[in-house]
Design a protein with these regions (language model features):
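Conserved catalytic cysteine-centered active-site region
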Residues: 1, 56-114, 118-150, 188-214, ...
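Conserved active-site "lid/cap" helical segment
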Residues: 1-90, 98, 158-166, 187-188, ...
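Condensing-enzyme catalytic core mediating Claisen C-C bond formation in acyl metabolism
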Residues: 1-24, 137, 171, 202-312, ...
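Electropositive phosphate-/nucleotide-binding environments in soluble metabolic enzymes
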Residues: 20-28, 62-65, 93, 145-152, ...
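Beta-strand segments within the central parallel beta-sheet cores of soluble alpha/beta enzyme folds
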Residues: 43-56, 81-87, 111-116, 167-174, ...
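Short glycine/threonine-rich loop-to-helix capping motif typified by GTGT followed
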Residues: 59-67, 255-263, 332-356, 364-373, ...
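Active-site-proximal alpha-helical scaffold in enzymes
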Residues: 86-117, 148-182, 222-229, 394-415
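Gly/Ser/Thr/Ala-enriched C-terminal appendages of enzymes
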Residues: 381-407, 414, 423-430, 436-439
Length: 452
């Protein structure tokens, strides 16, 4: 496999509705941003780019079949090769990794990955119905299943087994909204308190409206390349491009229905799901105690796909201790509860300790005043962009939005793009992006690193 670099990215402004632009025009907004950051015109880029990968979640939201080819044509990239990917909420993350594969395999030297969603064409209730179609339509959907209900069920089990509290979940919401306050591309730039989150309208107990991501219109685009492609881009732009290398990718899957997921024995958990930083006598004993008391993995409250994706990505990137070796994470926080669950499955803390980790301060930015009394200093900021909860969740763009913000963090250009360096992770050298579908059916994890 060849080295792969993520050299540029652009995003549109995320909003509840963007009636000013069609979905191809939103993609062009992000595409133009990415090219401008490279110092290239469309004509120059067209001579260099080999093809693209497109990402959008739902034909229903787009109100258009084959919407990706319309965006490809609008960008002026025909007849270059392209294909569309779809994987629920993980669609953008899959798109990024498909572009990586095109470069790593030698099929392309320069590949554009772009994604979009326009969710404002329908009322929120209808949008929730469309999203619910990404569950089992033979069993779950007909009896009124919807995603906020699924996640409420998962977190109540997590609360029962591990003592996780609604206040710990609210810490995630406060953190992500306060981060988004400093992100000019974010949809919800609000300053919140724990009380604000808990007193918001209840959607599905214990999840309030401020525990849940928002529907959005938006687009994002990234440019990935090989060493040869990088040389072509630099020659055309006449400038050196800061190197950000994609050093690891991982994916995982699980059954659509949570009840269909097997409960692993202690030995099988150690064999298949133990992360590298967990292979210590102390942590093995901790897990043995959980199993002795009747706990199982993944249960209905954990994401085995996320653990598998993390394990694969860490293996490729040579990461032994994610909390110590990763400088920031852009994580798929569709719900505050799912961010807590994902802390555990990415190895930022142990299985069952996500709630305490959320309220500890370790996932917070050191440069933001959250108005909270936090016991620990920041260790690995999670969702410095504001995440899905506050920055927005235009599904097909979301995983690519994470990649764009990660690229800017590692190029140390957050201050340039945001006109405010509050959210710049100091001396960031390595970041992770995490994209998640369904109740953990598809998950991607990618590791990006600054290369001098």
């Amino acid at each position: 496999m060849r080295p792969v670099y993520a050299v540029s990215g652009g995003v549109s402004k995320f909003a509840k509705a963007r009636p000013d632009k069609t979905f191809p025009a939103l993609v062009k907004e992000a595409y133009d941003y990415a090219l401008d950051d490279l110092g290239l015109t469309h004509r120059q880029f067209l001579e260099i780019v080999d093809g693209s990968v497109a990402s959008y979640f739902s034909d229903h939201f787009a109100r258009q079949l084959m919407a990706a080819i319309m965006a490809q044509d609008y960008l002026g990239l025909c007849p270059k090769p392209s294909h569309r990917v779809e994987g629920g909420g993980a669609t953008g993350g899959i798109c990024f990794q498909e572009a990586w594969k095109a470069i790593a395999s030698g099929y392309m030297d320069v590949c554009l990955a772009y994604g979009f969603e326009t969710m404002s064409h329908v009322a929120t209730w209808k949008g929730n119905e469309f999203i619910a179609l990404a569950s089992d339509v033979s069993t779950d959907y007909p009896v009124g299943g919807f995603y906020s209900g699924y996640y409420a069920m998962m977190v109540t089990r997590h609360m029962k087994e591990f003592g996780t509290t609604p206040e710990q979940m609210a810490h995630v919401s406060v953190k992500n909204h306060m981060n988004a306050y400093h992100n000019p591309y974010a949809q919800k730039r609000q300053k919140l308190s724990i009380a604000d989150v808990r007193n918001a309208p209840m959607v599905a107990w214990p999840l309030t409206r401020l525990d849940i991501c928002v529907m959005s219109d938006g687009a994002a685009a990234t440019v990935l390349c090989s060493e040869e492609g990088l040389a072509k881009l630099e020659k055309a732009s006449g400038q050196r491009i800061p190197r950000v290398r994609v050093t690891g990718i991982g994916r995982g899957t699980d059954a659509m229905r949570m009840a269909d997921r097997p409960h692993q024995s202690y030995d099988d958990f150690l064999k298949y799901n133990l992360l590298p930083n967990e292979d210590t006598p102390e942590t093995r004993a901790y897990y043995q105690d959980l199993w002795d008391r009747g706990f199982r993995y993944p249960g209905i409250h954990s994401f085995r796909a996320g653990r598998m994706g993390s394990k694969e990505a860490y293996k490729h990137a040579g990461i032994a201790d994610p909390l110590a070796e990763i400088d920031f994470v852009e994580l798929h926080d569709a719900y505050t509860s799912s961010e807590i669950q994902t802390y555990e499955d990415m190895g930022l803390c142990r299985y069952g300790e996500g709630g305490a980790f959320a309220a500890s301060g370790k996932a917070f930015m050191p440069s933001v005043d959250y108005g909270l009394d936090l016991a620990d200093k920041p260790a690995c900021p999670v969702n410095p962009s504001g995440g899905l909860i506050a920055c927005g969740h235009p599904v097909g763009a979301t995983g690519l939005m994470q990649a764009v913000f990660a690229i800017w963090q590692l190029q140390h250009t957050i201050g340039k793009h945001f006109e405010d360096d509050t959210l710049q992770v100091s001396n960031a050298k390595r970041g992770a992006i995490h994209s998640h579908a369904g109740t953990g059916t598809y998950v991607t994890v990618s590791i990006l690193e600054k290369e001098d």
